[in-house]
Each structure stands twice: as structure tokens, then as C-alpha cells.
Design a protein with these regions (language model features):
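Non-catalytic, conserved peripheral segments adjacent to functional cores
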Residues: 1-94, 111-133
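Short beta-strand His + acidic residue motifs that chelate non-heme Fe in jelly-roll/DSBH
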Residues: 98, 106-111
Length: 133
């Protein structure tokens, strides 16, 4: 496991007329403030990455489809320096929130043929200045 990366199981509350899917509470580990939330659609088989945020803490949730994430730690002062971590998230199999700290490289791939959506609840607003590709 990469130092600072947290995988938090989330609740799905079944209700008549449609389920409620938890995302992030202010009281939970991983919450580092609120800057913005955005959704990203990933087509089946498409890989998006590599990306690295210099300041942003990402809280990634997959409410629709299935997304595989690969992370890499190049932080020289980290206990997990040069390690990889993989995790696949989906509502049906592994409904969790993936918290990714700044300076960890990551990429992701859509695994569902119909639709794949991830939600990022970020602690700061997105800026190209703090993003490496």
C-alpha cells in the first residue's frame, strides 16, 4: 500500500425508488477541505494517465461502471518510494472511496462496456499549474 493512500468502504443505502450512495463526510479520514467536485466519464478500455497533482488531495468514487486505478509513488521521502498499487472500484463489487495524496502518480481505465464514471471530491480547485502529465 502506498503511504498516504486510503481506501474507505462506503455505504449503499437501498431505498424504494432508488439507492443512496455515500461519498464523503467531513468527519471522515480523507477529508482535507473542499475545493471542487467533478465527474469524469471514462470510455470502455480507455486509459487516462499518468497524472500527478502537486497540491490536490483526490477523493475518488466510482458510482457507475467499473474503474481500475494504478498508482505509483516517486516521493523519495516516502516509505513506499517506487512502489505501485492497483485497485478496482465499482458500485457492485468494491464500493469504496480512494484517497490519493499530492505527488502520487496515477492512471485509470474504464472496465464497463456501458458507462464508467468517477467522482473526484478535491480539496482545492483544479489548476493546470499544479498538475503534471
Amino acid at each position: 500500500m502506498i503511504e498516504g493512500v486510503v481506501v474507505t468502504p462506503l455505504s449503499v443505502i437501498e431505498t424504494k425508488g432508488g439507492d443512496v450512495l455515500h461519498g464523503l463526510k467531513q468527519s471522515e479520514q480523507g477529508y482535507a477541505g473542499f475545493g471542487e467536485a467533478y465527474f469524469s466519464m471514462i470510455e470502455y478500455g480507455v486509459i487516462k494517465g499518468w497524472k500527478q497533482h502537486k497540491k490536490m488531495v483526490l477523493n475518488l468514487v466510482v458510482p457507475i461502471g467499473m474503474v481500475r486505478f494504478v498508482l505509483y509513488d516517486e516521493r523519495k521521502d516516502s516509505r513506499s518510494y517506487e512502489q505501485f498499487q492497483e485497485i478496482t472500484l465499482s458500485r457492485s463489487m468494491n464500493y469504496c472511496r480512494l484517497t490519493v495524496p499530492p505527488m502520487v502518480w496515477f492512471g485509470f481505465q474504464g472496465y464497463d462496456k456501458l458507462a464508467n464514471m468517477l467522482l473526484n471530491i478535491a480539496n482545492i480547485e483544479h489548476s493546470q499549474d499544479e498538475l503534471n502529465h
